[in-house]
């Protein structure tokens, strides 16, 4: 950060005075810079209404203080307050996070507010000729002095923000009381791997709040507070899975399965510890593990390239993975849901899948192909399990239900989400970027090889998102990007969503000027998803032509 190239104002400022004739003819003035000079002692309050300004030149005046209202000029990228008599700066100056240059030379500043450390996009901070303390001046003289000083200020800024209010629990529908059901809850959470939590990416967060030892406490607290029956995590570091997450969650009755990204297989044991991957945990009192699977997208791309250069050069080079566990519901879960003894003899299985797709917005084609690969493999897993375990597990719906959790790195209007939620996508969808994938994509049709119909690749699931209709305005919240990229999908008609955990209070974020996460009070750049699902169970055999749903 910052990612956009900054063009400083032209020092040769040109002034054009509009003639009365131009004004009479309706000519509009467009100006984004303002200079005020002439030994001005105070500033008019009307100045703070000029929120369109990007540069403000206030040097060579007689200003002794700057009002806190200056923070209303939120579009400023350049502010020059040099050669004044300013003795102190308002803390609110730290909220002007668009600033790239701040010139404070030759004033009477003895201290700087720690809030200045929040100006993470600042490239130049000029402080010559001020009676500042020696440690501040020494920091300024070091290589990359501005960055070092800002880091020092931010790391020493006390956190006065109160904890966010609890996220609301949103009921969507009542459980089906007319038939046997099993209720269980699912969490999906990208925990932000330590190696990605850098000041370069998250310059607005103090270094101590990016530290994994600090963040992991809040992460595990959030996970445990939800008390989900199934937990799907992305960006879990290999070493942290075994030494932290598995240890903490096993103590609370969970078992888990984890796979690192494909690059781990070529690394030394020491390097492998820091590779992130996907994990699924489940409560052993409610589920029994039947099978576990890892899906490596680069291996699938290599095996199914069919001569496609895009498949080899774009998809195969990305090492994202997915994992899946086939779980059997324990009798106790069914009895807890129904409040009655479970008298059925059939096994009830469910497949839980978790994936993390490639991140780069320029690779929408890769995300879409990875999603197709994953769903194809999930379908294969379900089909094989159904055949090997025979009809005793299928019930009246004819297939094993699916819960799919993922950081898809794709917005709701993307080809990825269209593919999942509508059952298919056109082979000429814009997200393929007109690259040649057609021959290889037929291999991933969930309707079997050559399963394309009318130029559309389809899959055999009926998937629905637990968070529909804008229930969450964003699941990823950084300074540069705010949007929905995390999802919980489930298969219909066997599964329904009864309730979900709502979004973090938007007013809390705005009122506390939180421009991005992580934050000292929010440990990841993602917000967790949490849903209560209802699984419709097969009716017990008929007695005199009447179904007995769990003998209720």
Curated annotation (Swiss-Prot):
> A single GO CC term, please?
CCR4-NOT complex
List the subcellular locations. Answer: Cytoplasm; Nucleus
Q: Which reaction does it catalyse?
A: Exonucleolytic cleavage of poly(A) to 5'-AMP
Write down the PROSITE patterns for this protein, in alphabetical order. Answer: LRR
Q: What cofactors does the UniProt entry give for this protein?
A: Mg(2+)
Q: Where does Mg(2+) 1 bind?
A: 235
What are the UniProt keywords, alphabetically? Activator, Cytoplasm, Exonuclease, Hydrolase, Leucine-rich repeat, Magnesium, Metal-binding, Nuclease, Nucleus, Repeat, RNA-binding, RNA-mediated gene silencing, Transcription, Transcription regulation, Translation regulation
Q: Where are the LRR repeats?
A: 52-73, 75-96, 98-120, 121-143
The EC number(s) this enzyme carries: 3.1.13.4
What's a single GO MF annotation on this record? Answer: RNA exonuclease activity
Catalytic machinery residues: 407
**Chain residue ranges for the region called Nuclease domain:** 153-552
Per UniProt, substrate binds at 235, 271, 356, 361, 409, 476, 481
Subunit: Subunit of the CCR4-NOT core complex.
The family note in this entry says: Belongs to the CCR4/nocturin family.
Annotated function: Poly(A) nuclease involved in mRNA decay. Has 3'-5' RNase activity. The CCR4-NOT complex functions as a general transcription regulation complex. Enhances ligand-dependent transcriptional activity of nuclear hormone receptors.
Q: What is this protein called?
A: CCR4-NOT transcription complex subunit 6
Organism of origin: Xenopus laevis (African clawed frog)
Q: What is the lineage of its organism?
A: Eukaryota, Metazoa, Chordata, Craniata, Vertebrata
């Amino acid at each position: 950060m910052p990612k956009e190239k900054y063009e400083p104002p032209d020092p040769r400022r040109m002034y054009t005075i509009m003639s009365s004739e131009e004004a009479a003819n309706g000519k509009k003035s467009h100006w984004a810079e303002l200079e005020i000079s002439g030994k001005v002692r105070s500033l008019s309050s009307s100045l703070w209404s000029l929120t369109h300004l990007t540069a403000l030149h206030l040097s060579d005046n007689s200003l002794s203080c700057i009002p806190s209202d200056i923070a209303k000029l939120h579009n400023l990228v350049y502010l020059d307050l040099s050669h004044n008599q300013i003795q102190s700066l308002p803390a609110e100056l730290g909220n002007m996070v668009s600033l790239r240059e701040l010139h404070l030379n030759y004033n009477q500043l003895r201290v700087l507010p720690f809030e200045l450390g929040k100006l993470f996009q600042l490239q130049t901070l000029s402080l010559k000729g001020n009676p500042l303390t020696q440690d501040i001046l020494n920091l300024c003289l070091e290589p990359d002095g501005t960055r070092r000083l800002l880091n020092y200020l931010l790391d020493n800024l006390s956190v006065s923000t109160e904890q966010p209010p609890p996220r609301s629990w949103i009921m969507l529908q009542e459980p089906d009381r007319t038939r046997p059901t099993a209720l269980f809850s699912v969490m999906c959470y990208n925990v932000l791997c330590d190696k990605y939590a850098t000041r370069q990416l998250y310059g607005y967060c103090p270094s101590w709040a990016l530290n994994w030892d600090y963040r992991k406490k809040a992460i595990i607290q959030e996970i445990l507070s939800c008390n989900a029956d199934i937990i799907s995590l992305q960006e879990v570091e290999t070493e942290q899975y075994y030494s932290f997450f598995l240890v903490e969650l096993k103590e609370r009755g969970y078992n888990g399965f984890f796979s690192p990204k494909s690059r781990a297989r070529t690394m030394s044991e020491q390097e492998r510890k820091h590779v992130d991957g996907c994990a699924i945990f489940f409560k052993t009192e409610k589920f029994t593990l039947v099978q576990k699977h890892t899906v490596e997208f680069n291996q699938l791309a290599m095996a199914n390239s069919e001569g496609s250069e895009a498949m080899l050069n774009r998809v195969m080079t990305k090492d994202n993975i997915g994992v899946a566990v086939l779980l059997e519901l324990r009798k106790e879960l069914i009895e807890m849901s129904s409040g009655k003894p479970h008298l059925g003899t059939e096994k009830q299985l469910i497949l839980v899948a978790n994936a993390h797709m490639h991140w780069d917005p320029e690779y929408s084609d890769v995300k879409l192909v990875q999603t197709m690969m994953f769903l194809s493999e999930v379908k294969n897993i379900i089909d094989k399990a159904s055949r090997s375990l025979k009809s005793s597990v299928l019930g009246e719906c004819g297939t094993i239900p699916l819960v799919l959790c993922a950081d898809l790195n794709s917005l709701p209007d993307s080809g990825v989400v269209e593919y999942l939620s509508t059952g298919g996508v056109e082979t000429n969808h814009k997200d393929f970027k007109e690259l040649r994938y057609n021959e290889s994509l037929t291999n991933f049709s969930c309707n079997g090889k050559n399963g394309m119909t009318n130029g559309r690749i389809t899959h055999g699931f009926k998937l629905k998102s637990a968070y529909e209709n804008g229930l969450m305005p964003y699941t990823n919240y950084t300074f540069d990007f705010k949007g929905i990229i995390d999802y919980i999908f489930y298969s219909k008609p066997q599964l329904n969503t009864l309730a979900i955990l709502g979004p973090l209070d938007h007013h809390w974020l705005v009122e506390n000027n939180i421009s991005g996460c992580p934050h000292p009070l929010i440990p990841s750049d993602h917000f967790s998803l949490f849903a209560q699902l209802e699984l419709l169970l097969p009716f017990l055999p008929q007695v005199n032509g009447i179904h007995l749903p769990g003998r209720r």
